[in-house]
């Protein structure tokens, strides 16, 4: 027979959940994909999810022979993070309700802070929409610049968009809004509570966990030969066929010695095109270094899929994923964007960053003498609390655990804003 859980411990767990729910700022705005235990075990903790398809338009009455094959790409979603808070409670400490409340808040703060930090770092390092401001962001125009960038790319305006501002930026924007002669409660809320609310088409959130984007070493780096990416659903290795992650590509350059993951660059002549209509936005596409793979190769986001290669290096179906005007030219010099370190404010189209929620098979029948409680939070993450103690020591060991993964499902629909030069 499994041990029963003391009332004090049950109340403590409820308090942890309540505090955790109140602190998961970014996770609450992300998409949640629950991966069940059996799927996780049978797929080595990774499943492939379909990327949004883009249609191809043919004009005219007779479209004989113009049919386009369906090319559906996929993105890997993985469980890879186990966060824990472990501590002991004595029989004396269990008597004090206020002590238990404080420890519950500390536990929830630790777990939620780690989740928020991981999400902020993911977008800060992989989001490809980089809005580099001439001065520190301070008002409506800065958020409006993000809105304009997303609109030019035809990122759906009917979907919710969110921006997560570092505290200093949030307060500067609150001050700007408080000085506006606007209708409604926003100026008063900004003045009294430093609250912005819905601002320039975005839900705004004040955060204290946004990272700093370091300054790039800015080495002189050139592209080795003309390069672009051909969207392909699958790849074959050693006779095995499996999905291909098309979010990025390998770029070969003259050298990578001082380049770092997270660096931002543009390529002369390589301009953005909008996702649906394929209009030239007249803005250089910003790229992120995701990883350094060798002395001359690096993985970058997003992939370079040139509009002018349709019918040549790309089929029409592959061309539906075009995101730039032309390929990276041979010998083109990379222009580094983050020439100065700057505090990041991140933004996204809701649903483009995902929390993969996992489960761990823990129960009292498997671990004799231990008690387990589990609950799924509103952010989709399951919190498990394990307790184990002995009367001889008068001490209860407590372990709080969550298991999840984070994935930037579409780096072309999220990014960062700040002063990086």
Language-model regions: role of each:
Residues 5-9, 92-96, 100:
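Disorder-to-helix initiation segments
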């Amino acid at each position: 027979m499994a041990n029963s859980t003391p009332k004090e411990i049950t109340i403590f767990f409820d308090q942890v959940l309540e505090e955790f729910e109140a602190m998961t700022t970014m996770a609450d705005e992300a998409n949640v994909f629950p991966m069940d235990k059996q799927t996780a075990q049978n797929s080595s903790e990774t499943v492939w999810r379909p990327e949004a398809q883009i249609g191809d338009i043919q004009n005219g009455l007779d479209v004989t022979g113009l049919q386009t094959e369906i090319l559906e790409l996929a993105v890997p979603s993985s469980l890879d993070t186990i966060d824990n808070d472990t501590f002991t409670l004595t029989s004396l400490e269990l008597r004090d309700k206020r002590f238990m409340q404080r420890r519950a808040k500390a536990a929830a703060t630790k777990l939620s802070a780690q989740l928020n930090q991981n999400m902020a770092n993911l977008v800060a390092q992989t989001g490809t929409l980089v809005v580099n401001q001439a001065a520190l962001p301070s008002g409506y125009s800065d958020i409006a610049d993000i809105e304009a960038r997303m609109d030019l790319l035809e990122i759906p305006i009917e979907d919710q968009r969110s921006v997560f501002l570092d505290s200093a930026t949030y307060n500067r924007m609150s001050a700007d809004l408080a000085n506006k002669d606007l209708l409604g409660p926003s100026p008063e809320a900004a003045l009294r509570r430093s609250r912005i609310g819905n601002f320039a088409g975005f839900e705004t959130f004040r955060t204290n966990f946004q990272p700093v984007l370091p300054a790039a070493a800015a080495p002189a780096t050139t592209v080795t030969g003309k390069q672009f990416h051909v969207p392909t659903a699958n790849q074959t290795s050693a006779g095995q066929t499996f999905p291909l992650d098309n979010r990025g590509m390998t770029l070969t350059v003259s050298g990578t010695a001082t380049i770092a993951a997270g660096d931002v660059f543009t390529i002369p002549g390589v301009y953005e095109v909008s996702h649906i209509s394929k209009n030239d936005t007249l803005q250089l596409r910003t790229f992120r270094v995701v990883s350094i793979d060798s002395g001359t190769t690096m993985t970058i986001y997003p992939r370079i899929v040139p509009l002018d290669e349709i019918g040549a290096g790309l089929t029409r179906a592959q061309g539906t994923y075009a995101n730039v005007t032309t390929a990276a030219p041979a010998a083109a010099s990379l222009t580094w964007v983050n020439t100065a370190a700057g505090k990041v404010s991140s933004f996204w189209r809701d649903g483009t960053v995902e929390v993969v929620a996992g489960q761990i098979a823990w129960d009292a029948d498997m671990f004799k003498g231990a008690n387990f409680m589990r609950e799924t939070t509103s952010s989709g993450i399951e919190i498990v609390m394990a307790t184990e103690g002995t009367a001889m020591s008068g001490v209860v060991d407590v372990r709080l655990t969550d298991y999840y993964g984070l994935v930037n499902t579409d780096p072309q629909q999220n990014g960062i804003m700040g002063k990086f030069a």
